[in-house]
UniProtKB/Swiss-Prot annotation:
Location relative to the cell: Cytoplasm, Cytoskeleton; Cytoplasm, Cell cortex; Cytoplasmic vesicle, Phagosome membrane
Name of the gene this protein is made from: Coro1a
Record Pfam families: DUF1899 (PF08953), Trimer_CC (PF08954), WD40 (PF00400), WD40_4 (PF16300)
Protein name (record): Coronin-1A
N-acetylserine modification, residue list: S2
Residues modified to Phosphothreonine: T418
Tissue: Expressed in spleen, lymph nodes, thymus, brain and at very lower levels in lung. Also expressed in cells of the lymphoid/myeloid lineage. Not expressed in Kuffper cells.
The keyword Cell membrane is annotated on this UniProt entry: no
GO molecular function: actin filament binding; actin monomer binding; cytoskeletal protein binding; identical protein binding; myosin heavy chain binding; phosphatidylinositol 3-kinase binding; protein homodimerization activity
Quaternary organization: Binds actin.
Predominant cellular place of this UniProt entry's protein: cytoplasm
Composition bias type Basic and acidic residues, residue spans: 403-418
PTM description: phosphorylation at Ser-412 by PKC strongly down-regulates the association with actin.
UniProt cross-references to Gene3D superfamilies, sorted A to Z: YVTN repeat-like/Quinoprotein amine dehydrogenase
Length: 461
């Protein structure tokens, strides 16, 4: 009688645990825009999500601990003139976030430590260079102030945020159609992209050369997403010819055949992959799904091992993924997602069950810290470096806000090109000031109501 051998893995029993109601963000208006990005970005200080807004594009930023019901008059980041499609926190400054929008611009914002008390309309810098909507923004993982944007003009621009200049351009000759996804390698030397022309490319952005390319990694017509994983491999999600969802693992040096190809189900939502290099686990989250699947990647065949699936009743409209330094290591939490419902953002902790509450060194190797390994000039000059690692043994405390230094010469020149008439303020300026006054009045009224209730309580005693 043959006996089935079960592969040993410390992650075999990882389980997902949704947060209690008082630890969720309630009454948020998640964007209805159709676009395959996560719509949510988190770091150890803040949770940000793209929300519905009248008269332009906006997103909400809240301090991570400010859970519960979100006031309808909460101040928003609202400088874009059309819907926001993607947001990304800077990995080297937890107070800086980038946004890409249908208004063809990328904006970089600085959030104060306590969060916003008034609507934020003026970015630190506006990056203009795309001719169609900007659907992807991604920070360089190890070089300071280097930001990538991809637009529906089929162009990828790499920006030096410190100067506001587009320092690298990958034009339509590289991607002849819509770019579905872009991901940096761990050291930032390469990017991998997926495109509507059904090709996945590995590109050296400083040279503008395609170093590897795979035509039709999935036979279906729906969007493919690709991310770098460990040891020179990439993972793709897509659809078969029969519209079955698939996940595949590839060696970038031998793209003829996948190392592993697995069919999952027949749902229609595009799968967004999130890879954790510390544990070699990849999580697949589908927009419109109510589940998160997770797989472990190993260096030996069959390479891609299904671990389990977290399921819930309500479908997800988007998903945020917390960097490792924002997790609770004393609870053996190895990942945390922020699931967007229609009117709620719900944290979901992925946990390894352990009996001891001591620090589990095998679960938490040194991880990427908040300090950049290179300057923008060093990276543009040809240097590469992996992330500077930190230990989580004593926990992680986010540093106080660091000022984002920007040479405003370029941005100021643009603004001077379209000056406002002096003297009487413009109607746009007046309407903004009126809205600020209304928001302040609403805040004062709520504080007064709280004072009245406290006085009644004291008098009753």
């Amino acid at each position: 009688m043959s006996r089935q051998v079960v592969r040993s893995s410390k992650f075999r029993h990882v389980f997902g645990q949704p947060a209690k109601a008082d630890q969720c963000y309630e009454d948020v208006r998640v964007s209805q825009t159709t676009w395959d990005s996560g719509f949510c970005a988190v770091n150890p200080k803040f949770m940000a999500l793209i929300c519905e807004a009248s008269g332009g594009g906006a997103f909400l930023v809240l301090p991570l601990g400010k859970t519960g019901r979100v006031d309808k008059n909460v101040p928003l980041v609202c400088g874009h003139t059309a819907p926001v499609l993607d947001i990304a926190w800077c990995p080297h400054n937890d107070n800086v976030i980038a946004s890409g929008s249908e208004d063809c611009t990328v904006m970089v914002w600085e959030i104060p430590d306590g969060g916003l008390v008034l609507p934020l309309r003026e970015p630190v810098i506006t990056l203009e260079g795309h001719t169609k909507r900007v659907g992807i923004v991604a920070w360089h993982p190890t070089a300071q102030n280097v930001l990538l944007s991809a637009g529906c003009d089929n162009v990828i621009l790499v920006w030096d945020v410190g100067t506001g200049a587009a320092v690298l351009t990958l034009g339509p000759d590289v991607h002849p159609d819509t770019i579905y996804s872009v991901d940096w390698s761990r050291d930032g030397a390469l990017i991998c992209t997926s495109c509507r022309d059904k090709r996945v490319r590995v590109i050296e952005p400083r040279k503008g050369t395609v170093v590897a390319e795979k035509d039709r990694p999935h036979e279906g017509t729906r969007p493919v997403h690709a991310v770098f994983v460990s040891e020179g491999k990439i993972l793709t999600t897509g659809f078969s010819r029969m519209s079955e969802r698939q996940v595949a693992l590839w060696d970038t040096k031998h793209l003829e055949e996948p190392l592993s190809l697995q069919e999952l189900d027949t749902s229609s939502g595009v799968l967004l992959p999130f890879f954790d290099p510390d544990t070699n686990i990849v999580y697949l989250c589908g927009k419109g799904d109510s589940s998160i699947r997770y797989f472990e990647i190993t260096s030996e065949a069959p390479f891609l091992h299904y671990l389990s699936m977290f399921s819930s009743k309500e479908s997800q409209r988007g998903m945020g993924y917390m960097p490792k330094r924002g997790l609770e290591v004393n609870k053996c939490e190895i990942a945390r997602f922020y699931k967007l419902h229609e009117r709620k953002c719900e944290p979901i902790a992925m946990t390894v069950p352990r009996k001891s509450d001591l620090f589990q060194e095998d679960l938490y190797p040194p991880t990427a810290g908040p300090d950049p390994a290179l300057t923008a000039e060093e990276w543009l000059g040809g240097r590469d470096a992996g992330p500077l690692l930190i230990s989580l043994k004593d926990g992680y405390v986010p540093p106080k806000s660091r000022e984002l230094r920007v040479n405003r010469g370029l941005d100021s020149a643009r603004r001077r090109a379209t000056p406002e008439p002096s003297g009487t303020p413009s109607s746009d300026t007046v309407s903004r000031l009126e809205e600020d006054v209304r928001n302040l009045n609403a805040i004062v009224q709520k504080l007064q109501e709280r004072l009245d209730r406290l006085e009644e309580t004291v008098q009753a005693k």
